[in-house]
Amino acid sequence: MTRKYFGTDGIRGRVGEAPITPEFVIHLGYSAGKVLTSSDWHLSKGERPAVLIGKDTRISGYMLESALQAGLSAAGVDVLLSGPMPTPAVAYLTRALRLQAGIVISASHNPFEDNGIKFFSALGAKLPDATEQEIEAGLNAPLKAMPSAQLGKARRVNDARGRYIEFCKSTFPNHLDLRGLRVVVDCAHGATYQIAGPVLHELGAEVVAIGIHPDGLNINHECGATHGAALQEAVRHHRADIGVALDGDGDRVIMTDGEGMLYDGDQLIYLVAKHRKQNGLLKGGVAGTLMTNLAIENGLKKLDIPFARANVGDRYVLELLQIKNWQLGGEGSGHIICLDKHTTGDGIISALQVLYAMRDSGKTLTELASDVTLYPQQLINVRVPKGFDAHNSLAIKTAQAEAERDLDTTGRVLLRASGTEPLIRVMVEGESGQKVKHWAEKIAEVVRNAAAGERSVEKALPN
């Protein structure tokens, strides 16, 4: 059974347009509540299931939170409200408070006009596909509230922020601190705005916090992990030792050194893996994605660290880690998963693992990263007819084979279809920037011509 609403990261869309409407979200809460109350959650007789709702700082969060709460309450589920809270914090608190599920209202790194809803299980992991399908199956059922005595209650979790701050700090070794470090942290006017700074400060750092004035409309706007320029400028202006930028819901991180040089998720994973390997702390290998820079794979090989690629998306990285029984993985966008520290990707905790490597080794971020330089990489998006399959084109196959022969072991070619738009993404990377540019443009042109030919055939066909 295919899912209509749930994607790889919950349900997401433009606010006010289906499915991100108050009416839909009430039904979503009700259906999710009915699934919870009908499942075997090992509850005592008469005990109601309880769910935590967290959100980021989008103005639409108030509306969607109320709708979700109403639907859950109508189904007989108690609701705990955390207010603005990072996605990984909701995953942690769901486990820590022994709740039946956690729900996050967020569209992550997207602009404020978008929003979304994602679910966590009692174990702090994303819901199994089967459970999401069960929730979807109940969306069209009539909303019939429980008798008044059985309606769910709601309350605020006033210590949610403090609990999560302490959890983050617990992932940093007790024998080390951040005294003497000036750290700029960019919270993207998002869910970490009252959390990331205190975590770093309580570990001893001198903290300069930016992106901490959310107004409901400015989340991710020219700041945070998707706009590193704001962090670079602040690090240089304040003469900081290091910079940390998170996205709107706190599950992504990028960093800068004291010169303002940006380090993406690929590089940060490499640094953490290298430190763990050198100290006998690395279990297994590292999971990346199809887009992980080849220089990272080659660098890990030199350190005798196994590496494997998953499809793009932190959900698939997590699945690969679980299959291989490894602990460390992620992607260049800044989703980093440390399964020995948390059940899901966590921007703050990932940054702390990099800071741990710095403090433990006595080296700066620049020094730690000096042995690996990312290969030039070019990505070109080519618009194609819906359903176009690049792998069926002999011309495209020939061009790709020619590029791979020329690049040999010093480069890589990847063609993949977008999961959301009618696009073929042409990615070429390698040691030679000149070769990368040449082959990316050549293959993209071949794809355009093949797609144009298919359009011509479509037009020639009778209606």
Curated annotation (Swiss-Prot):
It catalyses: alpha-D-glucosamine 1-phosphate = D-glucosamine 6-phosphate. Its cofactor is Mg(2+). GO terms for cellular component: cytosol. It comes from the Bacteria. Activated by phosphorylation. Keywords: Isomerase, Magnesium, Metal-binding, Phosphoprotein. Disulfide bonds: none annotated. One of its GO terms (molecular function) is phosphomannomutase activity. InterPro entries: A-D-PHexomutase_a/b/a-I (IPR005844), A-D-PHexomutase_a/b/a-I/II/III (IPR016055), A-D-PHexomutase_a/b/a-II (IPR005845), A-D-PHexomutase_a/b/a-III (IPR005846), A-D-PHexomutase_C (IPR005843), A-D-PHexomutase_C_sf (IPR036900), A-D-PHexomutase_CS (IPR016066), Alpha-D-phosphohexomutase_SF (IPR005841). One of its GO terms (biological process) is UDP-N-acetylglucosamine biosynthetic process. Binds 1 Mg(2+) ion per subunit. The modification Phosphoserine is found at residue 108. It is an enzyme of class 5 (isomerase). It holds the Pfam family PGM_PMM_I. The keyword Phosphoprotein applies. The active site is at 108 (phosphoserine intermediate). Signal peptide: none annotated. NCBIfam families: glmM, PRK10887.1. Belongs to the phosphohexose mutase family. PANTHER family: PHOSPHOGLUCOMUTASE (ALPHA-D-GLUCOSE-1,6-BISPHOSPHATE-DEPENDENT) (PTHR42946:SF1), PHOSPHOHEXOSE MUTASE (PTHR42946). Catalyzes the conversion of glucosamine-6-phosphate to glucosamine-1-phosphate. This is Phosphoglucosamine mutase.
